[in-house]
From Swiss-Prot:
Organism: Debaryomyces hansenii (strain ATCC 36239 / CBS 767 / BCRC 21394 / JCM 1990 / NBRC 0083 / IGC 2968) (Yeast)
Keyword tags: ATP-binding, Ligase, Mitochondrion, Nucleotide-binding, Protein biosynthesis
Biological processes, Gene Ontology terms: glutaminyl-tRNAGln biosynthesis via transamidation; mitochondrial translation
Assembly mode: Subunit of the heterotrimeric GatFAB amidotransferase (AdT) complex, composed of A, B and F subunits.
Summary of the function given for this chain in its UniProt record: Allows the formation of correctly charged Gln-tRNA(Gln) through the transamidation of misacylated Glu-tRNA(Gln) in the mitochondria. The reaction takes place in the presence of glutamine and ATP through an activated gamma-phospho-Glu-tRNA(Gln).
The gene coding this protein: PET112
Protein name: Glutamyl-tRNA(Gln) amidotransferase subunit B, mitochondrial
Record's signal peptide: none
Compartment annotation: Mitochondrion
Cited NCBIfam families: gatB (TIGR00133), PRK05477.1-2 (NF004012)
Additional facts recorded: This protein may be expected to contain an N-terminal transit peptide but none has been predicted.
Amino acid sequence: MITLKRLIHSSRSVCSSGFKVDPNYKLKCGLEIHTQLKTKYKLFSLSSSKFDSEPNTNVSYFDCGLPGTLPKLNPEALYLALKTAVALNSDVQSFSTFDRKHYFYPDQPQGFQITQRYHPIARNGYLELNSKFDDITEDSKTINIEQIQIEQDTGKTNYDKYDKLIKIDLNRSNVPLIELVTKPDFENMSQIRAFIKKYQTLVKHLDVCTGDLETGAIRIDLNVSINGGNRVEVKNLGSSSELASALKSEYHRQIQLTKENFPVIQETRGWNGKETVRLRSKEDAVEYRYVPDSELPFINLDPEISREIAAALPDLPDAIITKLISEPYNLELKHAKFFIANKDILNYYYDLFQIVVIDAGKDHKVANNWLVHELIGAFSKFEVPLDISLIPPTKLGEIIIMVSNDELTTTSAKLLLSQLVKSPDDKELTIQELIEKYDVGKIKDITENELSEAVEEVCVYIIANNQDVIEKIVTGKPKSINYLIGLAMKETNGKVNSNVFESKFKELIADYK
């Protein structure tokens, strides 16, 4: 089943590998997070922003650096950047500009990247972490955000080992990014993990970005220093495990240099899977030649823009989690966190709760358990990609209500869910049609005496063929009766409630004692 468990870090441990901060070498760490924006078009052209298409199929003249082509700012990218900035409590700047960062690399055909070095779109934000929601050991921790800036993504460089060629794909060139730069406020890995997870959840919730590390939609750089010394940047870390390993490696590298009386040089390093490796000196050097971009106008925003965007924002994740663990939902915290990280499931839950609890008056625990344990669990059990549209909330709600009204056994209901998950073609059938198709309806048109006789016949048959289980039950292992009940439910295709079989088995087994 999809796991809802969290890693629990001890107060001194920084990551699962046992990385501890040496009190003699105080760690200071900041993050630079590059986030691809979910826009239809690229940042400065009308090419599609889908960079996973066939190589070089979504490339305009501007994207490939053709001389004479001019940029035109995509307003959707600006809006998504502003949404993120406001949600992160940032000061949106009424005046911002674009600058050119010059460097030569094959995946940057213009010879420069358009970014916002001098006047970014937002400054001075923050994100609050707390021990209740964010798996940190401290009661609370504020991570300050220095700035948020809009910039272009680069193309992709791929080495073809068969053709022995370096191939350039410019589909990703000029895809809009925001770069978030934090202050060096992180003191351990648990804080870093918590911040990244919370940020991922936020941008997904706002529909600003897919939030995926694996696909490169979010890419992270570490800035690491010890005892207030020079800052070293570690580039392009694509997972939490890489972050933890790279931080541990760089922290110990700087400690070793300090112990041997060597200076820690301000530079950019990469991660090769085992250690950080030098790439280049830091960008404070003059070779980047930052200059204002003369082809793009200044961005002048109305001072009221922040309030207007804030008013249009949906409830943010922490507020929703607080609502979900309170009346009337009363979800467990781990389930609330899971729902907030999966917006489609959250909306599904709201609809299901309305149908089962508000409209039908059933217990809230029933709706919670059937969605989390039975429906989502069925997808995991049968290794089917999670697609809750196969079983709309109206259909699951009907199943839950029938079980609650004793019109359908729990076993039959689970069987129906399993079939809906495994057989997408059944999606169009009604619940009654599904019950008839799989013959899982409760036994009808039978007297109580006839039902009792049929149940006893099944139980007697099962007992006769499972004497070893009976021996376990009578010698002090009463839970073994569940095995017999399971056999009986299977024998009757789930048409009789399990408690009926349980009572009959206990009655018959009592004669053995």
